[in-house]
């Protein structure tokens, strides 16, 4: 009998997965993968489908994604219509054991349409704006949602996940407090954005979005609309256009030439800026805005 247990111990030491297999977590976007890594610690292995610099609304569904998700235990969706392509990946994975989590649950959603939504309004999300992670105060909400899901999949470590989620929520609060001081030192926080991606960020840090380069969400800028923005920029001394890297730079160049507006090109998700983690990315966006001449 002793020899039997000795051999089992040796197998566990040589092949760690035989004794302690990690929970595999797939996430639609890198921010959710980053938060899940903080919550899961050594018990999880996380990967994201969409790259940080990609448009998370439009991801090509590849068979390789389905294969990866077929081996996952948990799939984290952004929700609110952000990543509807996730459904095709989940269905194609044929993974009946997969726990699917809507990470928007519990978040205070902004920009819910008051009435019916139609095509004339552009790419409007009927359940509200889906870019909630750009307010770091929502990071703790998401962390707790992820911890609850991981605890259901792996009850033996449920307390660990909950503890790490609370620690992460505290980190989010501390990071927000520090970054809010940076934001409050910016004298003019009236900005343009290319797309309606930044309301949560603006709400968190006291920015006012005076207009978008797109006349309506998803519709490219028109000459008349850009001319209107030039007038607004001059009258309100707007110095910044916040733009994602996958949009054309033409509108930004026009606004800079005609009104001195500078483009700050930043991804919506972590790993696309200088800093790799969720909170570090938000910090990097804020510091990039503070560094613009005329803003600080």
Please provide the spans of the model-predicted regions.
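Bacterial N-terminal signal peptides that target proteins for export
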Residues: 1-8
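Cleavable N-terminal signal peptides
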Residues: 8-9, 19
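Extracytoplasmic metal-acquisition and chelation regions
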Residues: 20-296
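N-terminal signal peptide c-region/cleavage motif recognized by signal peptidases
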Residues: 14-16
